[in-house]
């Protein structure tokens, strides 16, 4: 897989700059440091691309030997991705003799977004439907295809290539995220997608490219390079932090509901500020009223081989025998083999109750009050 260039208004960051247009130019002033998670995702994409091309009879070079983050889990995930795409291709062949299938296709949506381009993992065109499939290797954030601006930008780029060649009337977008057991699909008419592009995407992209518009903080701040020093984010969180807090029983229900809706972002922001200040201090910056000290440290062996030798000579066993945890075991065996051998021995206890917004897709728990009411209803 060829190295990818990055646009100022990239599709992958579109959720952020569509909500907060000035963040695009602000982030341009920061170095792109990357992360281990991003590198792992790049490796997974390369492996998935190879498997798909091989299955489709296209020339491809096996990248496995050069993949730093290769694992049995990645092998399983990318095999599942390839199988899923092939299933969609076979389904397309039921209504179209010769569907168009493209892997890692560069798309250009600069008609709406200045310098707008990206790479679609898979595009399938058949029977009036343009289908875009995107592989997500990430585990931390569940990604939905519904109203996903990255997917909509890729779809617009694909329409730029093929709308004049094929009679397309519907666009289907799928997120394949195997480590979260998530396959999310969203469909939209071509007309509605173009309407969004003209009425929302294009005018907001013009603001963002010019560095104009208003700063707005929200969950999209999580991947913003400027999140630690952003004044708008600080002001929004400090406004909540300066709330005239009383003992919780004295707050009204409405006040508590407002706080619940914002407290996670407040905690995240505070954590980001602490980490930023620490890294700056380690680089030599002095913060008034604060100093660097050594944190708590645990004892450790400085020569494990010598410890083993000494303990064994004394007649003791220095090793602890402990079963691998579920995540480590799945990584060792691979998901398919893990499921085959151990599914019967896995249980998932009830999780600890937590308050989440109503938009959360998990079903609501039954409280003791609800259980009591249900019992009375059944009497």
Please give the residue ranges for each predicted region.
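Extended, charge-rich alpha-helical segments
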Residues: 268-379
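Mg2+/Mn2+-dependent nuclease catalytic core
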Residues: 39, 97-206
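Short, charged, low-complexity amphipathic alpha-helix
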Residues: 172, 194-264, 363-379
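Metal-dependent nuclease catalytic cores that hydrolyze phosphodiester bonds in DNA/RNA
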Residues: 1-130, 170-172, 263
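Short coil/turn segments at secondary-structure boundaries
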Residues: 27-29, 60-65, 99-104, 215-221, ...
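Short, polar/flexible loop-turn hinges at active-site or ligand-entry regions and domain interfaces
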Residues: 29-37, 56-58, 139-145, 162-165, ...
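DEDD superfamily 3′-5′ metal-dependent exonuclease/proofreading module
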Residues: 1, 46, 52, 56, ...
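Hydrophobic/aromatic-lined pockets within catalytic cores
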Residues: 52-56, 137-140, 155-163, 206-209, ...
């Amino acid at each position: 897989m060829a190295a990818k260039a990055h646009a100022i208004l990239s599709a992958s960051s579109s959720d952020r700059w569509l909500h907060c247009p000035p963040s695009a130019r602000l982030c341009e002033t920061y170095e792109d440091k990357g992360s281990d998670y991003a590198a792992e995702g790049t490796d997974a994409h390369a492996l998935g691309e190879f498997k798909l091309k091989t299955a489709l009879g296209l020339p491809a070079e096996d990248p496995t030997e050069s993949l730093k983050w290769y694992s049995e889990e990645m092998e399983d995930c990318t095999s599942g991705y390839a199988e899923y795409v092939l299933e969609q291709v076979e389904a397309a062949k039921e209504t179209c003799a010769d569907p168009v299938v493209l892997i890692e296709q560069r798309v250009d949506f600069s008609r709406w977004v200045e310098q707008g381009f990206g790479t679609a993992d898979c595009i399938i065109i058949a029977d009036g439907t343009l289908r875009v499939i995107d592989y997500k290797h990430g585990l931390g954030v569940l990604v939905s295809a519904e109203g996903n601006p990255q997917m909509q930008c890729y779809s617009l780029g694909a329409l730029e290539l093929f709308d004049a060649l094929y009679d397309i009337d519907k666009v289907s977008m799928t997120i394949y995220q195997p480590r979260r057991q998530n396959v999310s699909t969203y469909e939209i008419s071509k007309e509605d997608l173009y309407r969004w592009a003209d009425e929302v995407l294009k005018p907001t992209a013009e603001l963002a490219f010019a560095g104009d518009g208003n700063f707005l903080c929200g969950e999209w701040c999580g991947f913003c390079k400027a999140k630690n020093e952003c004044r708008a984010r600080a002001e929004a969180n400090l406004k909540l932090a300066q709330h005239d807090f009383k003992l919780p029983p004295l707050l009204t229900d409405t006040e508590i509901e407002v706080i619940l809706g914002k407290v996670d972002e407040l905690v995240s922001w505070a954590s980001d500020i602490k980490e930023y200040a620490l890294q700056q201090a380690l680089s030599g910056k002095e913060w008034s009223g604060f100093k660097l000290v050594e944190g708590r440290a645990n004892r450790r062996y400085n020569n494990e081989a010598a410890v083993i030798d000494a303990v064994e000579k004394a007649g003791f066993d220095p090793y602890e025998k402990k079963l691998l945890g579920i995540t480590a075991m799945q990584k060792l065996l691979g998901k398919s083999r893990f499921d085959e051998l151990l599914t019967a021995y896995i249980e998932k206890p009830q999780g600890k109750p937590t308050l989440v917004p109503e938009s959360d897709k998990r079903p609501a728990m039954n409280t003791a009050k609800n259980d009591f009411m249900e019992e009375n209803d059944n009497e």
